Amino acid sequence: MSRSLKKGPFVFYSLIKKVDQMNSNRFKSVILTWSRSCTIIPIMIGNTIGVYNGKEHIPVLVSDQMIGHKLGEFVQTRNYRGHKKHDKKTKTKR
């Protein structure tokens, strides 16, 4: 189910303030956020946002193709290490 158009996209207010400050300054740094559910809006383009994955902040460089998506879509929360490898030598017949 999608969000109602009259409500608009969800963006954390303090994140917008931080992005505006970075856009007004020449100095660019990583903006840390724990809000993975924020929608990416056009003023965020070109900024690097550190999105929390449950363990650490992963830097995400926002581009124009990301507009309308959520920040959490670009950071994995689970590590897939592959299936266990089986040794044919250690297998015993019964």
Curated annotation (Swiss-Prot):
Compartments it resides in: Plastid, Chloroplast
Annotated Pfam families: Ribosomal_S19
UniProt xrefs under InterPro entries: Ribosomal_uS19 (IPR002222), Ribosomal_uS19_bac-type (IPR005732), Ribosomal_uS19_CS (IPR020934), Ribosomal_uS19_SF (IPR023575)
GO cellular component terms attached to this protein's record: chloroplast; mitochondrial small ribosomal subunit
Keyword terms of this UniProt record: Chloroplast, Plastid, Ribonucleoprotein, Ribosomal protein, RNA-binding, rRNA-binding
Keyword Plastid: yes
Gene Ontology molecular function, alphabetical: rRNA binding; structural constituent of ribosome
GO biological process, one term: translation
Listed HAMAP family: Ribosomal_uS19
Protein task: Protein S19 forms a complex with S13 that binds strongly to the 16S ribosomal RNA.
Family assignment from sequence similarity: Belongs to the universal ribosomal protein uS19 family.
Protein name in UniProt: Small ribosomal subunit protein uS19c
